[in-house]
């Protein structure tokens, strides 16, 4: 079965799966723009995680980070998880973003997908972690996305915590007995 193609990116081919679990990815699958998982019918709405970059998870396969996000989303009582990223380039090592042979942010419309996902959710968890500090000039992407989200959906922004250098904590090893906190109320 062929995958539906969407023209969201000015002619750049993108495919998106349909159904309770899926992803929007470039045709070559080097970029992932959006991932979603319907977890159950009992929860109340969508929880979105905004992280650094996608790893190996795709429309049907989960990686450890996605499994952690699914666990937290269920724990907090949401029915659906969506995941967006500062960078769309898929890699298991964030440092590879510096050496990508193309722009690791993907198409400029990636920011619109991030904003839309956050606006469509009841809660958005900022969670890109400390790896952003090692990305040199790419670090500016976090400030760009954060500013856009502060403008378009400030009341929906949460995080697990902030690390010593101010970045929102990554969810992979987060204890499940800790609740998310308002992102904008934390001082750096």
Question: Where are the regions a protein language model picked out?
Answer:
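Short connector loops at secondary-structure junctions
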Residues: 79-97
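A short, flexible beta-alpha/helix-coil linker loop
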Residues: 53-56, 89, 131
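Active-site and ligand/interface coordination hotspots across diverse enzymes
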Residues: 1-63
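Short hydrophobic segments within beta-strands
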Residues: 50, 84, 126-127
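Membrane-helix interface/capping segments
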Residues: 60-61, 93-101
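Glycine/proline-rich loop-helix segments at beta-alpha junctions forming the active-site rim
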Residues: 97-188
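A short mixed-secondary-structure module that forms the rim of ligand-binding clefts
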Residues: 55-77
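Short acidic (Asp/Glu) patches
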Residues: 33, 62-70, 102-112
